[in-house]
Amino acid sequence: NLAGQHVDVRLTAEDGYQAVRSYSLASSGDSDIIELAVDEVPEGEVSPYLVEDVRPGDELEVRGPIGAYFVWTPTQTEPVQLIAGGSGIVPLIAMARQHARTGSSAPMRLLYAVRSAADAFYTDDLAQLADDAFLVDWAYSRSAPPGSERPAGRVDAATIAASTIPATEHPSVYVCGPTGFVEAVADLLVAAGHPPERIRTERFGGA
């Protein structure tokens, strides 16, 4: 699968009721193994089952990989800015992994916004991936850990200015997260001079 694609997971109850949810892939490449990261929503129809009930050996109905718009490939040579909110990191970690695996020379930078350090996905992976070719910036909306470069708060114009590749370098930008986060960040990027056509977004809702 390509970095940034997703799959549809369908669950069928004993009475025939079906629920389908889309989940981004944290994996990419030619492997037969796919990796999903599921953020459990307690009142959700699908995520609680995937998190609490699925066991090794269980079979799931999966369709995909799907998507050709929100993808990054190593053939792209322009700078790449990734911006994630919460579990929106999943398709972006796939891009970062592929960037490292293929030895891409394209500058890549990630701004990862979470409520607190405990809410972050792939903390260890990001620490291992971070190098001169892949910069990682953190934004904490509720509680910033000791030693953080900035106090806790929502991503704003100052965050974009300090922690992203400037529009003058003409990066491709990928933004993924909850709908409100994605819309707010996209507006901030446009205000900072990024052309809308260079901003690709993916948002999520139901679980």
Where are these regions (language model features)?
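Short, conserved phosphate/pyrophosphate- and ester-handling motifs at nucleotide-, phospho-/glycolipid
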Residues: G4, G88, P178
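A short, basic/flexible loop-to-alpha-helix module at the beginning of a structural domain
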Residues: G64-T77
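Conserved beta-strand elements of the Class I
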Residues: V80-I83, V173-Y174
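Reductase modules of NAD(P)H-dependent flavoproteins
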Residues: P107-A207
